[in-house]
């Protein structure tokens, strides 16, 4: 019998909602929320021969939260069904590969070679089939499988082997097209392989992977080393007061290891923009170009190549686009054309919006669309496309080390203490575990890690920057303290960057941040009305454009702003953005796109605060919230 473990209960809140996740009655709701669910994992035993065992159903279902709208549809996309018999078969095949003389050297240890395809269609990195990862026994069996985490894009299972070793099985949700998921897996595995073999970075070693459903598991997957230990996030206290003893050391204990890892990422400059893949996973054209210069290890010279970018914009909400349409914009870009990385983002969004508009006008889409809103979004991304080649001057003399800032470098968008495990088996060394959507782009276009990034008003000294601060009441002081702490944390990150990569510190310039804001906002385009933030960041440039042209910061010689905004349009835009912000503030759980942690959802529903509507959606019953607050 095989043991399956699926955890439900309060621990699901450990990743948590930020206090700003929903604005209306947030305090009231949170006070009334008390979980009554059992935190003990549910254990189920199943026969390997019974693939239709109903006990397995819960093991694959999404249980981390619920949605206020389209709940069943959203959960269905996150069902991670895979063949349990298939993973047993895969491990048996891996055991055979680990003993195959073609994969081991004279000392009996596996050596580095290109990924090998198994008969079932999956791939294995034979150099990682070591006794440290899978054990030494002649047979390799699955003892148990436990669901240990339901993330934003993947579900994580822990596979315990008969040898006592543990592996992580990662199954992606069906949130993107099959092509996009396939590209992401191929690139992420190659990126982790590069970080391990070339840079010697602390990342899990990948044992096997499948980029599509054609494998024993009947699902895309990555099977990798399990890292035991606590998350670095447990040490992160972003609002610790300066007066607290050891506060600076506490903050730096989290910032420094992540900054050190970024330093490794930045240590190599590449020959193209795009993403990393294994040689056989890119086109013949991309195979002809070396990813970087100076490689002397013969085992690595033909191992990796740069292919299409897997940055999130090329896959998020792009399910209706064909592989050909996506490739047109995600293709690799020559190193001497850095601004094309901005143009490509505008291009893919325009392609997607025009496709949506065509379906809406033909009344053949699968949802009701607001045609006027789509047309406004198209106009904004047309503006971004116009600005894309003008935002920066790659040869600017006013920008310190401009040449270095525009070189292709590795960028991981998920550098975060939530993705860092302190390996308890290796003296708590930090290991980095999430490389989805990693791309090669100009460093000047990269964003700070989200745990330290701050786009709000900066406060460097509460007493000096805020008139009358000392006379304010505590509630008002706390608002400014929050802004100060966010400013401080970002500043600590910039100081680390300056000490490690001084030649790249110009990214900290306020003018650089303003100039790249339209691009950054476009990368964060999640909901339709977010186009207003993109447009707003373009409008913001207008006031400073003449100065940017005069100082050769932007790639333009004409002082006239490239886009003509009428006064009427600017007034309308200001009203639209104010209305959108009010909509967000007045809609519970808007900041999480209607997602509610399951413990909270069940508790609020039991109290009558969340109620089901006639169409199967849910809403917050305001009257019941007010009653509970009395």
UniProtKB/Swiss-Prot annotation:
GO terms for cellular component: mitochondrion. Coiled coil: none annotated. Its main location: mitochondrion. Residues 1-40 form a transit peptide. It is found in: Mitochondrion. Keywords: Mitochondrion, Transit peptide. The keyword Transit peptide applies. The keyword Cell cycle does not apply. InterPro entries: Aminoglycoside_PTrfase, Kinase-like_dom_sf, Mito_inheritance_9. It comes from the Eukaryota. Transmembrane segments: none annotated. Belongs to the AIM9 family. This is Altered inheritance of mitochondria protein 9, mitochondrial. It comes from Debaryomyces hansenii (strain ATCC 36239 / CBS 767 / BCRC 21394 / JCM 1990 / NBRC 0083 / IGC 2968) (Yeast).
């Amino acid at each position: 019998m095989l043991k399956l473990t699926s955890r439900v209960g309060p621990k699901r809140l450990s990743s948590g909602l930020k206090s700003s996740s929903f604005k209306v009655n947030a305090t009231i709701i949170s006070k009334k929320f008390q979980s009554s669910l059992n935190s003990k994992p549910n254990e189920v035993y199943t026969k390997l021969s019974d693939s239709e065992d109903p006990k397995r159903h819960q093991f694959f279902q999404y249980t981390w939260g619920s949605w206020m709208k389209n709940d069943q549809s959203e959960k269905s996309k996150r069902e991670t069904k895979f063949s349990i018999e298939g993973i047993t078969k895969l491990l048996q095949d891996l055991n055979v590969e680990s003993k195959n003389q073609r994969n081991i050297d004279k000392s009996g240890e596996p050596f580095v070679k290109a990924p090998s395809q198994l008969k079932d269609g999956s791939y294995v990195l034979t150099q990682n089939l070591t006794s440290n990862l899978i054990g030494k026994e002649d047979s390799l069996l699955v003892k148990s499988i436990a669901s240990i985490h339901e993330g934003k894009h993947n579900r994580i299972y822990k596979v315990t082997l008969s040898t006592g070793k543990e592996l992580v099985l990662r199954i992606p949700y069906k949130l993107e097209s099959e092509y996009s998921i396939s590209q992401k897996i191929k690139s992420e595995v190659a990126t982790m392989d590069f970080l391990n073999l070339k840079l010697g970075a602390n990342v899990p070693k990948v044992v096997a992977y499948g980029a599509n459903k054609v494998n024993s598991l009947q699902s895309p997957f990555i099977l990798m080393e399990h890292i035991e230990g606590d998350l670095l996030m447990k040490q992160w206290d972003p609002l610790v007061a300066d007066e607290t003893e050891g506060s600076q050391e506490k903050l730096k204990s989290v910032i420094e290891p992540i900054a050190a890892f970024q330093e490794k990422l930045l240590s190599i400059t590449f020959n193209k923009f795009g993403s990393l893949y294994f040689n056989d996973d890119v086109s013949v054209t991309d195979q002809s170009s070396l990813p970087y210069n100076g490689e002397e290890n013969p085992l690595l010279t033909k191992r990796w190549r740069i292919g299409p970018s897997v940055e999130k914009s090329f896959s998020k909400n792009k399910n209706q686009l064909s592989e050909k349409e996506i490739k047109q914009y995600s293709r690799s870009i020559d190193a001497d054309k850095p601004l094309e990385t901005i143009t490509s983002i505008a291009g893919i969004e325009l392609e997607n919006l025009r496709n949506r508009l065509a379906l809406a006008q033909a009344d053949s889409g699968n949802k009701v669309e607001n045609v006027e809103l789509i047309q406004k979004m198209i106009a904004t991304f047309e503006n971004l496309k116009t600005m894309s080649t003008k935002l920066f001057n790659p040869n600017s003399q006013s920008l310190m080390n401009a040449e270095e800032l525009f070189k292709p470098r590795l960028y991981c968008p998920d550098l975060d203490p939530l993705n860092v495990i302190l390996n308890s088996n290796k003296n708590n060394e930090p290991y980095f575990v999430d490389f989805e959507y990693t791309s090669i782009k100009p460093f000047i276009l990269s964003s700070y890690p989200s745990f330290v990034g701050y786009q709000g008003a900066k406060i460097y000294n509460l007493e000096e920057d805020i008139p009358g601060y000392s006379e304010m009441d505590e509630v008002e002081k706390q608002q400014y303290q929050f802004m100060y702490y966010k400013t401080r944390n970002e500043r600590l990150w910039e100081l680390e960057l300056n000490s490690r990569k001084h030649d790249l510190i110009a990214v900290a310039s306020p003018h650089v941040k303003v100039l790249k804001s339209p691009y950054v906002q476009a990368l964060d385009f999640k909901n339709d009305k977010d186009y207003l933030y993109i447009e707003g960041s373009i409008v913001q440039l207008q006031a400073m454009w003449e100065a940017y042209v005069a100082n050769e910061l932007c790639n333009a010689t004409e002082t006239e702003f490239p886009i003509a905004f009428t006064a009427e349009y600017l007034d309308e835009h200001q009203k639209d953005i104010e209305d959108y912000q009010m909509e967000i503030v007045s809609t519970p759980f808007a900041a999480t796109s209607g997602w509610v942690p399951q413990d909270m959802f069940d508790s609020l529903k039991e109290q009558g605060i969340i109620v089901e509507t006639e169409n199967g959606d849910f809403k917050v019953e305001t009257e019941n919230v007010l009653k509970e607050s009395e």
